[in-house]
Amino acid sequence: MEPILALLLALGPFQLSRGQSFQVNPPEPEVAVAMGTSLQINCSMSCDKDIARVHWHGLDTNLGNVQTLPGSRVLSVRGMLSDTGTRVCVGSCGSRSFQHSVKILVYAFPDQLEVTPEFLVPGRDQVVSCTAHNIWPAGPDSLSFALLRGEQSLEGAQALETEQEEEMQETEGTPLFQVTQRWLLPSLGTPALPALYCQVTMQLPKLVLTHRRKIPVLQSQTSPEPPSTTSAKPYILTSSHTTKAVSTGLSSVALPSTPLSSEGPCYPEIHQNPEADWELLCEASCGSGVTVHWTLAPGDLAAYHKREAGAQAWLSVLPLGPIPEGWFQCRMDPGGQVTSLYVTGQVIPNPSSMVALWIGSLVLGLLALAFLAYCLWKRYRPGPLPDSSSCTLL
């Protein structure tokens, strides 16, 4: 009987007697408020004959946040973490008093998810991390992580220990946290899924909030043949904002020259110039009036040699030397579509050093041949037997 009575008191006005009522709006016993937002809780009391008196009590109740109206008091919650706690409204008619408590929970759950790595590569074991920033509350009772394959949890993923760290805040007294969940992934098969998703859920009284972040998976564009030392397997990485390509060895294979997508906006394409030792060509076959230019390269674009001519732009390493590992990006205007290429670090042979090495080897060979001829001449020339101790090394 007591639980039913408590539920009735929480859900509606309290019918005390003829001409009397005690009401709290919103009537829920627990209220969740987003940090930085405001909420007003109205507590009212009506009496038939006596004067109605209403008061708010609770943890650090600031009278400046209570607005007094005839027969009611309005409590304003400012959405600060200090507002978290229980507030009690007390109403009285003459000698009779009644009360209703409200538990206020201020939460912070911005859409600030960070996932690493930026993309997944099929065929290898990997660790995926998902970090939610500026979170409160951060306990496991209210915050949970999931690694999804579509709408289902990814089978075989091993969840590692969750890490929690306090965020640096400009305003003191605001203990927000960053929470990181890591998973050890099994080797993704081929063909792989287009993407995995990190999903973070905050569950509060009568409120469930969810944020999700996409982790693209590199898709092989070549036929499933065994890899060799003379060919590399290019990958295409697609996302909702940009189209990116990645290759594990540009020195032995040209990038695919077919359009990355046959639908939607036209994107520029990146190729390796086979006529140069190492040169990238970005071009756009998107009609007249378009231009392309390089916008990103490992290190600094100033360290590369650039040539741009309308819908074509070339980029090469100058001077010859090791190629930094990282992303190369080309942009097309108008439209702003970009294409990115990931290149692993490699060393380009220097022609001058190759010539010097060849000449040095030739000179050493000639010296060795001359030494051998000298020793044979001393051993087999007519006359007394010579001392051949100097040629024993042969």
UniProtKB/Swiss-Prot annotation:
The chain crosses the membrane at residues 354-374. Its main location: membrane. Residues 219-255 are annotated as: Mucin-like. InterPro entries: Adhes-Ig-like, ICAM_VCAM_N, Ig-like_dom_sf, Ig-like_fold, MADCAM1. Detected in Peyer patches and mesenteric lymph nodes but not in spleen. Residues 375-394 are cytoplasmic. SUPFAM superfamilies: Immunoglobulin. Keywords: Cell adhesion, Disulfide bond, Glycoprotein, Immunoglobulin domain, Membrane, Repeat, Signal, Transmembrane, Transmembrane helix. Residues 20-353 are extracellular. It is a single-pass type I membrane protein. GO terms for biological process: cell adhesion; cell-matrix adhesion; heterotypic cell-cell adhesion; integrin-mediated signaling pathway; keratinocyte differentiation; leukocyte migration; leukocyte tethering or rolling; positive regulation of leukocyte migration. Residues 20-107, 108-225, 256-345 form the Ig-like domain. Residues 1-19 form the signal peptide. It is found in: Membrane. GO terms for molecular function: integrin binding involved in cell-matrix adhesion. Disulfide bonds join C43-C89, C47-C93, C130-C198, C282-C330. Cell adhesion leukocyte receptor expressed by mucosal venules, helps to direct lymphocyte traffic into mucosal tissues including the Peyer patches and the intestinal lamina propria. It can bind both the integrin alpha-4/beta-7 and L-selectin, regulating both the passage and retention of leukocytes. Homodimer. This is Mucosal addressin cell adhesion molecule 1. It comes from Rattus norvegicus (Rat).
